[in-house]
Each structure stands twice: as C-alpha cells, then as structure tokens.
Amino acid sequence: DKIKFVHMCFSTDPFMYKQPEISALSCKLVKILNKEGIKCTVLTKGILPARLAEYGINNEIGITLVSIDENFRRKWEPCAAPFADRIKALKNLHERGVKTWISMEPYPTPNIIKQDIREILDAVGFVDKIIFGRLNYNKLVSDYKGRVEYYNKLSEQVIKYCKSNGIDWYIKEGT
C-alpha cells in the first residue's frame, strides 16, 4: 500500500519560528514527498515559506490560530510567530492556489482571554477549511462555569460562518 499523505505538525513544528534550518529541511521534505506523489499536510505556529506554493497545489497548509491578541500569544505561545505574520504567510500561499486551513484549537475560555471569535474568523475568511476544538486538560477551562455551553455556542458560530463563506469545517469531537 502506498502512503497517501504525510502530516507535518507542531509536535515537531516543521516551520519553527526563527529556526531557518528547520524550515529549509521541512521544505526539502515536502518537495521530496511531492516528487514521490505523496501529499503533505502541514500545521505550524511558525511562518510558512512562500516557496511551498512551488511544490504543487495538492498539499494542505495550515496554521494554528486561537487568538489575534498579541498579549495572549506572548503569554501562551511565547516562541510562536506573531499572529499577523502567520496569517499573512498563509494568505500569500492561498492566493497562489495552495489549499489552506486553520486549526482553531485549543480555543481558550473567557476566563483565559475575552475575545470575539468573529474577529478571528474574519481575519482568516480566505481559508479553505477551519478546524475548531476546545482547550482540554486545563484547570482554568475546567473552572469556567458554562464551558460546555460556551464551546457549543462557538461551534455553532464557526459552522454558520463557514457555511455562509463557502469554507469547509470540522468540529473536534468533545468540543
């Protein structure tokens, strides 16, 4: 059986912020896999190189984005690329024909950060797919009264937004 795709993600982030040697190696891997007819799906908190568009449009390239508030990023994702830079790089790839997606997880509760999910959705309204999921295994989330209803409401908002903008979506089980 032939490998259908390889998923490169943040557990060993293929495009670590401020790590050009990792980014270069990841680009080489994508290129090699694509030459063998293997699609790549990529997820990063780094900045996506523009040259990914040169490898073909069958790949699916995504970023993690759970906020657009830089104070939140500095506290919760201190080594990740600024949100605006992630979005800009992803949009560049999308405009060049690459399939793009957003992982909006782990999405925080209001006792962690008060924010309007519609602002985030509007910032990434160009993508082909949005994956949404709750923040798990966190005492602050567990302490938030009404968390189940909160995540249900947000899931409905994501679905409604995606339907009205022609975007595919996936809501993680248990959200």
Language-model-derived ranges and their functions:
Residues 1-162:
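Conserved AdoMet/S-adenosylmethionine-binding subsite of the radical SAM
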Residues 155-175:
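C-terminal accessory regions of radical SAM enzymes
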